[in-house]
């Protein structure tokens, strides 16, 4: 019988959203996995430091079958986080959470996406992010740019951006002027971002 990995979270939901602190749905799932007669590997994708609460369960899962913690981290700028990720755990607490899981013997990866045009995609910002990841000795980093699908998603982001940094709204709209169904920006911008990321990876000796 084929065995797979149990995945908690995705690009549109977080298993450790604020309600989890009281409802403990993910905690109960983690405990079930940790004690199951079927030793199944698992991974968690989150931007919340609340995951550290359940480290005893996830460590047991890791010891039995393997566990990966994937943390969303795109910048070290707390002012940016407060504007674009209100209610989310601080970047500093996410870094500390990853450090704790690494010390516990778990694999840890960083989802460095989306890097926001004009906000978190500068060389200096990406370099600082990769340096922080190197300091923790994360196992891998998965970077990616921002997609803005035409319609509600794009309108929501531009509204938030206009409130935070109205000076870069026009340049952001220009990047996405092709209105691709995928939400991808102009290809020249995608290629340029990938080249810069690769250069910075080499600079900080993180050859993922």
Model-derived features: positions:
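C-terminal accessory regions of radical SAM enzymes
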Residues: 153-155, 160-208
């Amino acid at each position: 019988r084929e065995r797979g990995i149990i995945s908690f979270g995705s690009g549109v939901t977080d298993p450790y959203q604020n309600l989890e602190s009281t409802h403990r749905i993910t905690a109960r799932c983690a405990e079930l996995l940790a004690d199951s007669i079927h030793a199944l590997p698992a991974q968690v994708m989150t931007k919340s430091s609340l995951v550290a609460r359940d480290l005893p369960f996830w460590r047991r899962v890791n010891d039995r079958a393997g566990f990966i913690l994937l943390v969303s981290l795109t910048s070290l700028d707390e002012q940016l986080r407060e504007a674009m990720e209100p209610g989310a755990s601080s970047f500093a607490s996410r870094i500390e959470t990853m450090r704790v899981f690494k010390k516990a013997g778990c694999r840890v990866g960083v989802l460095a996406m989306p890097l926001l045009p004009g906000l978190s995609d500068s060389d200096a910002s990406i370099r600082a992010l990769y340096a922080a990841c190197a300091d923790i000795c994360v196992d891998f980093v998965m970077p990616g740019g921002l997609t803005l699908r035409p319609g509600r998603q794009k309108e929501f982001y531009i509204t938030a951006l206009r409130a935070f940094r109205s000076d870069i709204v026009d340049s952001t709209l220009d990047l996405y002027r092709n209105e691709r169904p995928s939400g991808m920006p102009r290809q020249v911008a995608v290629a340029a971002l990938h080249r810069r990321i690769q250069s910075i990876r080499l600079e900080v000796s993180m050859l993922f």
